[in-house]
Amino acid sequence: MKQAPARIGYLGPIGTFTQQALVGEPDLQSAEHLPFRTVADVLDAVQSGDVDLGFVPIENSIEGTVNYTQDALVFDYNLLIQREVVIDIELCLLVRPGTKLAQIDEIHSMPVATAQCHGFLRSNLPTADIRITNSTAEAAKIVSESTGLNTAAVAPRNAADVYGLDVIAENIADQEGNQTRFVLVGKENIPAPTGNDRTAIVVFQRADEPGSLLAILQEFAARRINLSQLLSRPTKRGGLGNYCFIMYADGHISDELVADALRDLHAKQGDVKFMGSYPAAVKHAQNTREHADARWREADDWVSELRSQIAR
């Protein structure tokens, strides 16, 4: 993406990890960054054209998929992922100046963040009430506006500077190596291939029967396409047991083998939603993809040569 779009909506308010990840993208820094209260608000703004692109969290290395983002992209919006961004996450406990740990009986944050710090909170603040917010920065803002010295927020360190809070405990996540993946989404356009890309699709099964998932996976295995992520989510229709499969595959739709796999899936399964081909944040095994593509082209040429010999 050579030129930054005019307006990018992101999960706000100011001070979220989402904003931190967004401003870390050099080619997007000159765009107008507009905070929204919820992920749905961001995606609504993209769908309506109020902003050009949206930037939202979609996966955490400790807690897994951010389901409300994933489900919204699968079921509620027709948007395309333009890129992904992965950043390291350090969660801190933020308080109003003068607050002591023993005084805290109310903790604000979003569910994904408090879940990542469950062990710390259980050991140090076992009786504190957990109050749900839409973002970690919103939690910090709420604490900054409180009048007592009994509230705290699980939030980024930079939110302390934004909202005038103190860091009473740092790096409180239960596991090391905490990272979050964010995606940039838009209404149209598939980015050009970079040689290190991912393709996201959703497959709705034509029939729930033995071997149905295996048949889907074989389309990728037969072409030596690596699936970096496979998720099953309820389709939200037809009661229990109705699931779709969200798949993230290494490669770009411009790759012959990826395109061929999607073509076969569409023909055999019928209901396949394309969610984008875009630059991957993590380097994958490119040599395997290049060799597989070369073998596919050679095989295609061989079949074409044989077919050219058919009597007219």
Where are these regions (language model features)?
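Domain-level signature for soluble enzymes in the chorismate/prephenate branch of the shikimate pathway
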Residues: M1-R312
